């Protein structure tokens, strides 16, 4: 039986919440048949501030974004990637990835599973929990999933593997934690 609950007051997404830690991942981005690989680094700089950097393995910056409260800043982006549509897609995907406490609209639970409906950048997102562990964030439109963030190899509030998959366009981002 599915029950409706009171919204939680604690962190929904703990994966990038430690300001003392640099989160470094090997990244592969597959977009419209083009593959880009490199290093993906996320750093929490303050209470509601994150910086996200994607570089080639040679150290060239592909993009460098900052999220602070409700603001988004493009610190640097490769000229070939400087397209408004791409920047907006990355902004939505990455905001959902690092936002720790989104505004909760509804909470549903069934046995060890919980589903939390939120609103991020005016888009409906669902946070899926299995035994209190965040496993997926899904953005929907008209009741259909259009973007899925899947977290795997989770240990001590750290996701060792993250896949961001778009259902409506050919875009997949795979992040694998480096030791």
Residue map of PLM features:
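Amphipathic hydrophobic-ligand
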Residues: 34-36, 57, 61-63, 142-146, ...
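N-terminal leader/targeting segments and the immediate start of mature chains
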Residues: 1-38
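Mature, soluble, non-transmembrane domains
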Residues: 26-28, 85-179
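Edge/loop elements at the starts and ends of beta-strands within beta-rich repeat scaffolds
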Residues: 16-20, 43-48, 67, 155-157
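An acidic-aromatic
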Residues: 51-98
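Short, well-ordered strand-loop elements centered on a beta-strand within folded domains, enriched
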Residues: 47-54, 71-78, 132-139, 157-163
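Short, surface-exposed charged micro-motifs
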Residues: 39-42, 62-64, 126, 148-150
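N-terminal beta-strand/beta-hairpin edge segment
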Residues: 27-31, 36-60, 67
